[in-house]
Amino acid sequence: MSDSPRTASDYFGAMGFEYDSLIHRSVPCYDAMIEKLINYLPRHPQTVLELGCGSGGLSLPLVRHAPHCEFTFVDASEEMVELTRARTQEHFPETARRATFVTARFEEYSMGRDQFDVVTSSISLHHVEDKGALFRRVREAIKSGGTFRFVDQLSGGTEANHARMWQGMLDFERAPGNCSDAEIQGLLDHAKAHDHHTPLAAHFHLLQEAGFVGIDCVWR
């Protein structure tokens, strides 16, 4: 087994442009998932925080959805933040001038109180071990009437379901044209070292404890 980089940000930051290709080859229905998330966002938010902007896979659709919004994009990897900044500047220069780009871990980033109409994230929150603490801070950061929308990798509610889910992921990654053996091993090493997957029911419980209401899962 190969050594995984010290942090998740090291792992993804080292990929740069290759991350775009890998995420499409390793995550089933990635584009459909992003489209579903966008479809459930408010039409005209004024302030949006994205936790884990990566290379802009969700960031650019967010800006396309609400180009007049003020965005804050946060990621633990400086390389990923700069990649998202460059892509936003290229495709949406006016929005990029209003946007804030932050290199920080979610656990350390100061979100403030009543700052955002929307807090959102794509395939990032499973890197956080204490999700309850993060959810409480997100709840404080959201304005009255605001919303928290995210997509992520979860664990199964039972060991059997979890094993079946991961086997489905591996089958997808091993399909012709998707991931190489080395890429799959790297993903497995990374998951073992850095991921903290949580069942859907536990997410619901932690979100409710944090003060969220109207909690739902609209796609899985």
Q: Where would I find each of the regions flagged by the language model?
A:
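C-terminal alpha-helical "lid/dimerization" subdomain adjacent to the S-adenosyl-L-methionine
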Residues: V151-A210
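Class I SAM-dependent methyltransferase Rossmann-like catalytic core
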Residues: A14-P28
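A short glycine-rich, Lys/Arg-flanked "PGG" loop and its adjoining helix->strand segment in the class I
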Residues: A133-S144
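Conserved alpha-helix/loop element of class I SAM-dependent methyltransferases that forms part
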Residues: P28-P45
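A short acidic, Gly/Pro-enriched loop at the edge of an enzyme's catalytic core
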Residues: M111-V118
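N-terminal, positively charged/glycine-rich alpha-helical extensions of SAM-dependent methyltransferases
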Residues: M1-E18
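Short catalytic micro-motifs in class I SAM-dependent methyltransferases
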Residues: I123-S124
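Class I SAM-dependent methyltransferase SAM/SAH-binding core
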Residues: L49-L51, S55-E108
